């Protein structure tokens, strides 16, 4: 890894990286063949949990009168794929990620999801370097202002659909994976969601969770619960 990249990340994150190999892994997509250092998938898994914990802590402190439900809505808005992808671009991470040839023309939601994953992998590296005390300043730097501004009126699509379905006929939405395609490192899931008494909808995404939310959003928009198309989220 170029020293210029490490120096740039140190400046942008406020963290001096101890493990250069781990940092390389955080910036390597699984489409890179025969990568000696591996890829960011396991780091992304860990970073997602660390991000959720520290943002939840931040919200708990910022909004002492907020209910658990409101805090959950705010949390979803701060750790979703779009927010993380926005921060990735703010940091300049997209230009630092190593990807295979077939991934270089990626765009739209799938590209945003990849950028979001890299941010979470980077969070994991900082956490493994020095624990929560090291990663907390980074989270505060890029999430604090957003935490104070995030709109608590729009809820996670699956949560809102669940509550809406319960008010309609007292049942829960049912999700079913009807198709999985794409490469192992870049899958596409197609999920159908059904609510008894209503026409089902289908959504797709880079993970089962993303596809479920996309399908839930379609019903919410169709039934007039959501007035605009929301961007896919992660977390």
UniProtKB/Swiss-Prot annotation:
DRBM domain residues: 156-225
GO aspect biological process, one term: rRNA processing
Cofactor: Mg(2+)
SMART domains: DSRM, RIBOc
Gene3D superfamilies per UniProt: 3.30.160.20, Ribonuclease III domain
Taxonomic superkingdom: Bacteria
Similarity comment: family membership: Belongs to the ribonuclease III family.
Protein name: Ribonuclease 3
Originating gene: rnc
């Amino acid at each position: 890894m170029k020293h210029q990249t490490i120096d740039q990340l140190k400046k942008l994150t406020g963290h001096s990286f101890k493990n250069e190999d781990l940092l390389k892994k955080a910036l390597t997509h699984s489409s890179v063949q025969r990568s000696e250092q591996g890829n960011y998938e396991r780091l992304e898994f860990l970073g997602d949990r660390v991000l959720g914990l520290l943002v939840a802590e931040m919200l708990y402190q910022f909004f002492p009168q907020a209910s658990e439900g409101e805090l959950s809505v705010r949390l979803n808005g701060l750790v979703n794929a779009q927010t993380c992808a926005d921060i990735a671009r703010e940091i300049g991470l997209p230009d630092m990620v190593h990807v295979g040839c077939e991934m270089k023309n990626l765009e739209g939601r799938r590209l945003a999801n990849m950028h979001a994953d890299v941010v979470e992998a980077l969070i994991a590296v900082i956490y493994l370097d020095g624990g929560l005390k090291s990663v907390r300043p980074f989270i505060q730097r890029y999430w604090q202002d957003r935490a104070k501004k995030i709109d608590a009126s729009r809820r996670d699509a699956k949560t809102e659909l669940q509550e809406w379905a319960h008010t309609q006929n007292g049942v829960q939405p049912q999700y079913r994976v009807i198709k999985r395609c794409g490469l192992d490192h870049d899958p596409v899931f197609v999920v159908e969601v059904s609510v008894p008494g209503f026409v089902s909808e289908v959504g797709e995404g880079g993970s089962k969770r993303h596809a479920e939310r996309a399908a839930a959003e379609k019903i919410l928009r169709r039934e007039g619960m959501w007035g605009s198309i929301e961007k896919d989220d992660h977390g």
